[in-house]
């Protein structure tokens, strides 16, 4: 499966959607909020193998946007079977 991760980054949050490229359907969505605060929060929802929606919420300290993005990549890798994540940076 080919997919693309679309990011919208604000001053203390990162929102994202993960799209499957053949049908342009959303296969995962979520956000990291309160970046830089003691209890940053990640909310992630995705379609499982049975095409049913699942959701998790996690909290931990995220000091900056780089660590927030790493958290997003980790949760996508944990919840989406067969997904390989490649980081691309454009400035």
Where in this protein do the model-derived segments appear?
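Extreme N-terminal starter segment of soluble prokaryotic enzymes
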Residues: 1-4
